[in-house]
Amino acid sequence: MELYILSNTVKHRFGDSFGRGTRLSLVGARGERVAFQAILPKPFHNAFAEADGEWDAEIFWERYVKLSASSSGVTAEREYPDVMVDASRAEKFKDNTSERGEGVLWCFVTIPADAAAGRHTVRLEVTADEGKVAVEAEIEVLDFCLPEQNGNVTSFAIREDMIKSADPGEFRKKYDELVEEHLHYRLSPTKLLPYGTWGIEEALSEARKRTADVRCAAYSLPYKTFREDTIYEKGQECLDTDYLRKLLTAFAENSTDE
């Protein structure tokens, strides 16, 4: 089995030719994730990565989507990279099968928080189906530690139809898991939009929890909506201003240092 290393400055599209590199050199701070793009030039169903000692490695798949040609001629009809999906989730949802004779993937390596500054040689072993390949990565660790709080602020929505559970407790558990996943990848949530009923006390508790979390660069409250027929659209989603007024009043009356 072979693994071809791609330059991180190159965006590989299905069908493009590519240089086949073997040397891998990365740089990052303690606690940071560094990454490289690679290709397994044969069909495979699943792939995982392991690293030496305290170094952690993780693989993401680059999933493709087929686009039609645009009327402007900017895009041709072909398959383009769409999103990256981590290997464990891809396997769970049967979303990691390569049908193109090659597989584009990203390998992430986490630099330990206590790693010594300087140059390290880390052995990475990638397993795909029944085959294995090992590569050595030269990783230069900078002499500082990445802060817990990050500046990568993102906005994402969580809908009831995304979390398949009618039980409120299970819904909240899965909701919290999604929030933690964003924080794990240094994406600080700014808008959480769960459908369903959030009590005022529950919203206050959640806000206190997130504003006290040093990993969160920003956070905003969930809000409540309802469906209403308007002159613009049937079943349009509208902001529940009465709920919002009660929520903001509760915050004003229960302010904290955070």
Regions found by a protein language model. Name each.
Residues 26-32:
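Short, solvent-exposed loop/linker segments at the N-terminal edge
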Residues 40-42, 128:
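Non-cytosolic beta-sheet module surface loops
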Residues 36, 47, 105-107, 122, ...:
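Hydrophobic residues positioned within well-ordered beta-strands of beta-sheet architectures
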Residues 84, 96, 110, 121-123, ...:
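Aromatic-lined carbohydrate-binding surfaces of glycoside hydrolases
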Residues 2-20, 33, 43-108, 115:
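Surface-exposed binding patches on compact interaction domains or structured appendages
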